[in-house]
Amino acid sequence: MKSLWRRSFFGAQGRIWPVLLAIAVILLFGCQSREAPLSPGAANFKHEIKSCLTNLSVTLIEPVVNKDLPEIKAALEKVESPAAKLCRLCPFEMGVTDQSGATLAVYPAKGDGKGKDYSNYELVKKAIKSRKIQQQRFFLQDGSQLYLICAPLLRGETLIGLVAIAVSSEDAAKRWGLTEKEFMAIDFNS
Protein backbone atom coordinates (compact mmCIF):
# COMPACT_ATOMS: atom_id res chain seq x y z
CA MET A 1 0.00 0.00 0.00
CA LYS A 2 2.81 2.38 0.94
CA SER A 3 4.62 1.83 -2.37
CA LEU A 4 1.37 2.33 -4.32
CA TRP A 5 0.84 5.69 -2.59
CA ARG A 6 4.46 6.67 -3.22
CA ARG A 7 4.27 5.73 -6.93
CA SER A 8 1.05 7.62 -7.51
CA PHE A 9 2.42 10.88 -6.06
CA PHE A 10 6.17 10.69 -6.62
CA GLY A 11 6.61 8.36 -9.60
CA ALA A 12 8.04 4.88 -9.78
CA GLN A 13 11.42 6.02 -8.44
CA GLY A 14 9.84 7.72 -5.43
CA ARG A 15 11.44 11.08 -6.17
CA ILE A 16 10.07 13.84 -4.04
CA TRP A 17 12.01 16.76 -5.58
CA PRO A 18 9.31 17.84 -8.08
CA VAL A 19 6.78 18.15 -5.27
CA LEU A 20 9.21 20.03 -3.04
CA LEU A 21 10.09 22.36 -5.90
CA ALA A 22 6.42 23.12 -6.53
CA ILE A 23 5.85 23.82 -2.83
CA ALA A 24 8.92 26.10 -2.71
CA VAL A 25 7.70 28.07 -5.74
CA ILE A 26 4.24 28.49 -4.22
CA LEU A 27 5.71 29.66 -0.92
CA LEU A 28 8.22 31.97 -2.59
CA PHE A 29 5.71 33.79 -4.77
CA GLY A 30 2.65 33.46 -2.57
CA CYS A 31 4.13 34.67 0.71
CA GLN A 32 5.91 37.84 -0.31
CA SER A 33 5.24 40.88 1.83
CA ARG A 34 3.65 43.93 0.28
CA GLU A 35 5.40 47.27 0.06
CA ALA A 36 4.82 49.53 3.03
CA PRO A 37 2.56 52.51 2.36
CA LEU A 38 4.23 55.88 1.79
CA SER A 39 4.95 58.12 4.74
CA PRO A 40 2.82 61.30 4.86
CA GLY A 41 5.81 63.36 3.69
CA ALA A 42 6.53 61.04 0.76
CA ALA A 43 2.83 61.01 -0.18
CA ASN A 44 2.77 64.83 -0.17
CA PHE A 45 5.95 64.94 -2.25
CA LYS A 46 4.45 62.54 -4.78
CA HIS A 47 1.20 64.52 -4.96
CA GLU A 48 2.97 67.88 -5.41
CA ILE A 49 5.39 66.55 -8.05
CA LYS A 50 2.60 64.84 -10.01
CA SER A 51 0.50 68.00 -9.87
CA CYS A 52 3.42 70.08 -11.13
CA LEU A 53 4.18 67.57 -13.92
CA THR A 54 0.52 67.58 -14.98
CA ASN A 55 0.47 71.39 -15.16
CA LEU A 56 3.74 71.44 -17.08
CA SER A 57 2.58 68.76 -19.52
CA VAL A 58 -0.66 70.55 -20.37
CA THR A 59 1.13 73.87 -20.83
CA LEU A 60 4.03 72.49 -22.88
CA ILE A 61 2.43 70.17 -25.44
CA GLU A 62 1.78 72.72 -28.21
CA PRO A 63 5.07 74.66 -27.82
CA VAL A 64 7.08 71.41 -27.84
CA VAL A 65 5.23 70.07 -30.90
CA ASN A 66 5.99 73.34 -32.71
CA LYS A 67 9.55 73.52 -31.28
CA ASP A 68 8.71 77.10 -30.28
CA LEU A 69 11.60 77.81 -27.87
CA PRO A 70 10.40 81.26 -26.69
CA GLU A 71 6.96 79.80 -25.95
CA ILE A 72 8.49 76.82 -24.10
CA LYS A 73 10.53 79.21 -21.93
CA ALA A 74 7.43 81.35 -21.34
CA ALA A 75 5.45 78.24 -20.35
CA LEU A 76 8.15 77.24 -17.86
CA GLU A 77 8.13 80.75 -16.39
CA LYS A 78 4.32 80.65 -16.05
CA VAL A 79 4.53 77.36 -14.20
CA GLU A 80 7.29 78.77 -11.99
CA SER A 81 4.98 80.02 -9.29
CA PRO A 82 3.36 76.61 -8.61
CA ALA A 83 6.79 74.99 -8.91
CA ALA A 84 8.29 77.48 -6.46
CA LYS A 85 5.37 76.72 -4.14
CA LEU A 86 6.20 73.06 -4.68
CA CYS A 87 9.44 73.50 -2.82
CA ARG A 88 9.70 76.82 -1.05
CA LEU A 89 13.31 77.98 -1.06
CA CYS A 90 14.45 74.70 -2.66
CA PRO A 91 16.93 74.94 -5.48
CA PHE A 92 14.98 73.26 -8.24
CA GLU A 93 15.28 73.08 -11.97
CA MET A 94 12.79 72.18 -14.67
CA GLY A 95 13.82 71.05 -18.11
CA VAL A 96 12.20 70.14 -21.40
CA THR A 97 13.74 67.91 -24.06
CA ASP A 98 12.64 66.79 -27.48
CA GLN A 99 11.73 63.15 -28.13
CA SER A 100 15.39 62.17 -28.50
CA GLY A 101 16.61 63.81 -25.28
CA ALA A 102 18.13 67.04 -26.66
CA THR A 103 17.38 69.95 -24.32
CA LEU A 104 14.95 72.56 -25.60
CA ALA A 105 14.75 74.72 -22.46
CA VAL A 106 15.74 74.81 -18.79
CA TYR A 107 14.29 76.98 -16.06
CA PRO A 108 15.74 78.74 -14.22
CA ALA A 109 18.53 79.13 -16.79
CA LYS A 110 21.96 78.36 -15.38
CA GLY A 111 25.44 78.52 -16.81
CA ASP A 112 25.66 79.35 -20.49
CA GLY A 113 21.93 78.75 -21.04
CA LYS A 114 22.68 76.50 -24.03
CA GLY A 115 20.79 73.27 -24.48
CA LYS A 116 22.55 70.09 -23.49
CA ASP A 117 22.08 66.63 -24.90
CA TYR A 118 20.74 64.26 -22.26
CA SER A 119 19.96 61.45 -24.70
CA ASN A 120 22.71 59.24 -23.22
CA TYR A 121 21.44 59.56 -19.64
CA GLU A 122 19.94 56.29 -18.43
CA LEU A 123 16.95 58.07 -16.89
CA VAL A 124 16.10 59.76 -20.19
CA LYS A 125 16.50 56.50 -22.12
CA LYS A 126 14.17 54.71 -19.67
CA ALA A 127 11.54 57.47 -19.86
CA ILE A 128 11.67 57.51 -23.67
CA LYS A 129 11.48 53.73 -23.95
CA SER A 130 8.79 53.12 -21.31
CA ARG A 131 6.78 56.33 -21.88
CA LYS A 132 6.26 56.39 -18.13
CA ILE A 133 7.47 58.66 -15.36
CA GLN A 134 10.91 57.60 -14.16
CA GLN A 135 12.97 58.79 -11.21
CA GLN A 136 16.60 58.57 -10.23
CA ARG A 137 19.02 60.06 -7.76
CA PHE A 138 21.91 61.93 -9.29
CA PHE A 139 25.22 62.70 -7.58
CA LEU A 140 26.84 66.08 -8.17
CA GLN A 141 30.60 66.66 -8.13
CA ASP A 142 30.45 68.16 -4.64
CA GLY A 143 28.88 64.94 -3.32
CA SER A 144 25.37 66.32 -2.94
CA GLN A 145 22.41 64.54 -4.50
CA LEU A 146 19.53 65.58 -6.69
CA TYR A 147 16.27 63.74 -7.07
CA LEU A 148 15.32 63.71 -10.74
CA ILE A 149 11.83 62.98 -12.00
CA CYS A 150 11.41 62.65 -15.76
CA ALA A 151 7.98 62.42 -17.40
CA PRO A 152 7.04 61.85 -21.04
CA LEU A 153 5.14 64.52 -22.96
CA LEU A 154 2.58 62.60 -24.98
CA ARG A 155 0.25 63.87 -27.65
CA GLY A 156 -2.15 61.00 -27.99
CA GLU A 157 0.14 57.99 -28.24
CA THR A 158 3.05 59.95 -29.74
CA LEU A 159 6.04 60.89 -27.60
CA ILE A 160 6.90 64.52 -28.36
CA GLY A 161 9.37 65.18 -25.57
CA LEU A 162 10.16 64.91 -21.89
CA VAL A 163 9.74 67.23 -18.93
CA ALA A 164 11.99 66.87 -15.90
CA ILE A 165 12.13 68.27 -12.39
CA ALA A 166 15.25 68.20 -10.24
CA VAL A 167 15.00 68.77 -6.48
CA SER A 168 17.88 68.81 -4.01
CA SER A 169 17.75 65.70 -1.81
CA GLU A 170 18.80 67.76 1.20
CA ASP A 171 15.95 70.22 0.72
CA ALA A 172 13.48 67.42 0.01
CA ALA A 173 14.49 65.87 3.33
CA LYS A 174 13.96 69.18 5.14
CA ARG A 175 10.64 70.02 3.46
CA TRP A 176 9.00 66.57 3.27
CA GLY A 177 11.18 64.38 5.49
CA LEU A 178 11.87 62.38 2.33
CA THR A 179 14.65 59.80 2.46
CA GLU A 180 16.49 58.39 -0.54
CA LYS A 181 14.86 55.00 0.03
CA GLU A 182 11.38 56.57 0.08
CA PHE A 183 12.11 58.60 -3.05
CA MET A 184 13.23 55.53 -4.96
CA ALA A 185 10.16 53.57 -3.76
CA ILE A 186 7.61 56.14 -4.99
CA ASP A 187 5.61 55.02 -8.02
CA PHE A 188 4.79 58.25 -9.84
CA ASN A 189 2.74 56.29 -12.40
CA SER A 190 0.03 55.24 -9.95
Which residues make up each language-model segment?
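Core beta-strand residues in small-molecule sensory/regulatory alpha/beta domains
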Residues: 97, 153-154
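A short beta-strand signature within small-molecule sensing/ligand-binding domains used
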Residues: 143-152
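Extracellular/periplasmic ligand-binding regions of membrane signal-transduction receptors
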Residues: 43-75, 99-104, 109, 181-190
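C-terminal motif of bacterial Sec signal peptides marking the signal peptidase cleavage site
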Residues: 29-30
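Helix-start (N-cap) segments at beta->loop->alpha junctions
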Residues: 154, 165-180
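Extracytoplasmic ligand-binding sensor domains of the Cache superfamily
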Residues: 77-130
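Glycine-rich acetyl-CoA-binding "A-motif" of GNAT/NAT acetyltransferases
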Residues: 159
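Extracytoplasmic/periplasmic sensor domains and loops in membrane signaling proteins
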Residues: 69, 73, 108-139, 178-185
